[in-house]
Amino acid sequence: RDRPTGIWVLRNRGNWADQTSPAKAGNEFNFLNCEGGHIYWWMAHPDRYFKTNPEFFGFSKLTGKREPETLCLTNPELLETAVENLKKRIRAFKEKPDLFTIGFRDSWNMCQCEKCLAPIPLPGGGTLIRKSDDPQEDPLYFSTRYWLFVNQIVERLKQDFPETMFAGSGYFYAAEPPACELDPA
């Protein structure tokens, strides 16, 4: 039952499976154990946090209010909450993942609060100035904002999970290579 799925994954150049995949059962093919993905809600689910901590969520200039579709990547309290929630999720897996992806929802939506649209001081010097409020028109700025957030999370998670590799999502606004180094973990 599992072998055909594993063969199909290999034929399509795949080398991983999550813990729920039929290809993972028995792991005859030595796939990487991968988890994560679209995990913004693992970091701060709107059902739990939106009423009590709306500042965790993205501000929309269009509506003039916080919206639960995305997160405010410059909020330091969100960062700490996200890290603690992700630690709990990773510890809850039967097997610790070989690779954990810190990805966003399939959307161009980004927080448009003053802090998220402010110039970005770059590690190593320099400043990245936003050219547009629209991530499609200024992907370098918004990619850098996202990857700096991912770097902060990875820096904290790798202290507790040194054997786990971490990744992010490189599409939508994050497809543009950022103006910062990525954490090599």
Question: Each predicted region: which residue ranges?
Answer:
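Feature activates predominantly on carbohydrate-active enzymes
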Residues: 1-148, 155-162, 167-170, 185
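Distinct, well-ordered alpha-helical segments
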Residues: 175-184
